[in-house]
C-alpha cells in the first residue's frame, strides 16, 4: 500500500467506532486458544478481514483463516466445521445480534500493548447482546475508529467538484442520520472532531467554518473516543 497515504488522502470527517466480535464455542476462553484453529474473517479485503489480520499478527497468534460470508460462516461454525467467526461493526451489529446458539459466546479481546497504537478499548454488555453474553455480564474487546476519507484531488479538477457537492449534501443532511431509523452509532459522530496528523479536505474545512461548527479540541476528542465504545 502507498507509503505516503497521508499525502494521497484527506479526511472529510471522523465517524463512529466499530467493535470487534470474536464468536466461538464456550471452550474458547481467549484469543490465544484460536492459534491453529479455523477462523472465518469474512470476505477478503473488507474491514473485518483487514482488522482480523492485523490483530492476530500483532498478538502473535496464527489461526487458519477462512474467507466466508458471515451467514455461511456462522452456519459452518454451528455444524462444527470451523472454530470461530470474526466480525467488525458498530453495535448493535445485525449478524451478531441475530446469532442464537447457547453453545457459543463472545471471546474477550484484551487491550494488549501491541494493539494500543491503532485501536481503542471497548466493552460489550448483556444489554448489547443478550444472545451471547449472560445477564449482567460484560466482555472486553477493541474498537476500530472509522474515517470518511477521500483522495486528495487537485481543487481545479472535476473529481474535486464532485467531492465538494458530496460534502455539502452529506454535512447538510447529517442531523437526519442521528435520528431513527438510522443506526444509533451516528449519534457518536462529531463532524468537527480532528484527526491528528491528517489533513481535512479543504472544502470540508471551509463548510465547517462557514456554518460555524465548533471545533473539538484534540484532548476532548481523545477523551470522547476512549469513552464512546463502552457507553454507546
Describe the function of each predicted region.
Residues 47-55, 122-196:
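Ligand-binding clefts/hinges and TM-proximal coupling segments of bilobed small-molecule sensing domains
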Residues 1, 62-158:
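Pocket-lining segment of extracytoplasmic ligand-binding domains
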Residues 17-79:
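Bilobed "Venus flytrap"/periplasmic-binding protein-like clamshell domains
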Residues 1-18, 90-93:
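Acidic, polar ligand-binding/catalytic clefts
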Residues 6-9, 17-19, 34-36, 77, ...:
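Extracytoplasmic
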Residues 72, 78, 89-102, 106, ...:
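An extracytoplasmic/periplasmic, membrane-proximal ligand-sensing/linker region
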